[in-house]
């Protein structure tokens, strides 16, 4: 689950990480009141969407008067903000953060992620803040410093000080940087976050260390422990299909391709998408129906896939272990009839009651394309999507 910048800063504030004074606003009038409450002479008007690159997309403006605040708030609220993370369709801006201006002397980068190799939390820091860390990694990898944190110990004073100095924090500000880094780690750990990022972490002209931005992602499987985090959820920022899928216990993620995928098991689903890509196709979604799929779940899965107007063909790839192939076949037949399927459908089933499932599909009278291997299924669905 993702949250907005201003919500991330609320979390940081609780963990004693210095952040600028700011007030969220949902209308132009609220933006003006926020600016008046904060006082001038400089404010920053920030679009609040779940995506990075807002500044380059015109979603962050520095205002030097109340009139500027009004103009920028009017322009940004309701706009369809397009960034490198939103895709060409962009995201509608429904809320703003009005924040006091900052005297930026230097921009730094810090983040915490789970390192899958060490199975521990990794702290990444760089002297190159204010830009995408991917760009830094590509062009100046030596400027990224990584520290694997021992969970039984946490981020020690010595480790925090060392990282701070490596990214260019002067000795007079190291203690402040230590406080920010340790606060960020504690926030990450205690909220079950999967990502915590401050970009940029700034040094001001008078030597203060301040988090000028905040990005948090949370492990959805741990949200039951954090009702205060769940309260931050903004459904307007989430994919409508993904919200609908969650109601039926379907793991669904929208993608940019034109081939719908219905698979049981996350590993097989990813392998299926890889194979489609291998043969020149583009998956339109990740969809794992799990091991307890019913006819209702399969029907809802078809509805989800077909709600994407880009879908030109569908691949159903099932391994019948816990899930029986005849149950899936029944669901596929029922779903195809219920949604009046008009796009090509390729089905590959292996495992429990495989022969019965295949017979049910063959006897259904539906124009279903059968395949025996994953490679064959991928080739056939790519060809079908291309109209061949």
Swiss-Prot record:
Keywords assigned: ATP-binding, Ligase, Magnesium, Metal-binding, Nucleotide-binding, Tricarboxylic acid cycle
Amino acids binding ATP: 46, 53-55, 99, 102, 107
GO process annotations (BP): succinyl-CoA metabolic process; tricarboxylic acid cycle
Pathway: Carbohydrate metabolism; tricarboxylic acid cycle; succinate from succinyl-CoA (ligase route): step 1/1
Pfam families per record: ATP-grasp_2, Ligase_CoA
Superkingdom per UniProt: Bacteria
Protein name (database record): Succinate--CoA ligase [ADP-forming] subunit beta
Protein's UniProt keywords contain Magnesium: yes
Record field: catalytic activity: succinate + ATP + CoA = succinyl-CoA + ADP + phosphate; GTP + succinate + CoA = succinyl-CoA + GDP + phosphate
Function in brief: Succinyl-CoA synthetase functions in the citric acid cycle (TCA), coupling the hydrolysis of succinyl-CoA to the synthesis of either ATP or GTP and thus represents the only step of substrate-level phosphorylation in the TCA. The beta subunit provides nucleotide specificity of the enzyme and binds the substrate succinate, while the binding sites for coenzyme A and phosphate are found in the alpha subunit.
Domain ATP-grasp: 9-244
SUPFAM superfamilies to which the protein is assigned, alphabetical: Glutathione synthetase ATP-binding domain-like (SSF56059), Succinyl-CoA synthetase domains (SSF52210)
């Amino acid at each position: 689950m993702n949250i907005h910048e201003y919500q991330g800063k609320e979390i940081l504030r609780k963990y004693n990480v210095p952040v600028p004074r700011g007030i969220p606003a949902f209308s132009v009038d609220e933006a003006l009141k926020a600016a008046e409450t904060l006082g001038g002479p400089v404010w920053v008007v920030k679009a609040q969407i779940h995506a990075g690159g807002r500044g380059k997309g015109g979603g962050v403006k520095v205002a030097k008067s109340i009139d500027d605040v009004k103009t920028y708030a009017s322009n940004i609220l309701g706009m369809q903000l397009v960034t490198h993370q939103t895709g060409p369709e962009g995201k509608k801006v429904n809320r703003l953060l009005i924040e006091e201006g900052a005297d930026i002397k230097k921009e730094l980068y810090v983040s915490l992620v789970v390192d899958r190799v060490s199975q521990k939390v990794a702290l990444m820091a760089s002297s190159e803040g204010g830009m995408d860390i991917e760009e830094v990694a590509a062009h100046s990898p030596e400027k990224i410093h990584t520290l694997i944190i021992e969970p039984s110990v946490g981020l020690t004073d010595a480790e925090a000080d060392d990282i701070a100095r490596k990214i260019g924090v002067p000795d007079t500000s190291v203690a402040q940087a230590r406080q920010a880094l340790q606060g960020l780690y504690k926030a990450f750990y205690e909220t079950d976050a999967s990502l915590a990022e401050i970009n940029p972490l700034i040094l001001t002209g008078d030597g203060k260390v301040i988090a000028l931005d905040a990005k948090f992602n949370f492990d959805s499987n741990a949200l039951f422990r954090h009702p205060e985090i769940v309260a931050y959820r903004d459904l307007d920022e989430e994919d409508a299909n993904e919200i609908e899928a969650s109601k039926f216990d379907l793991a669904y993620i929208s993608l940019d391709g034109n081939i719908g995928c219905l698979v049981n098991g996350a590993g097989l689903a990813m392998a299926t998408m890889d194979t489609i890509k291998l043969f020149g196709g583009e998956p339109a979604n990740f969809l794992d129906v799990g091991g307890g799929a019913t006819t209702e779940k399969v029907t809802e899965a078809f509805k989800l896939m077909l709600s994407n107007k880009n879908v030109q063909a569908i691949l159903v790839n099932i391994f019948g272990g816990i899930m029986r192939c005849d149950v899936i076949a029944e669901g596929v037949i029922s779903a195809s009839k219920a949604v009046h399927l008009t796009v090509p459908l390729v089905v590959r089933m292996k495992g429990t009651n495989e022969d019965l499932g295949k017979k049910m599909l063959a006897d259904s009278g539906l124009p279903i394309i059968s395949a025996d291997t994953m490679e064959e299924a991928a080739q056939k669905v790519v060809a079908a999507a291309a109209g061949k």
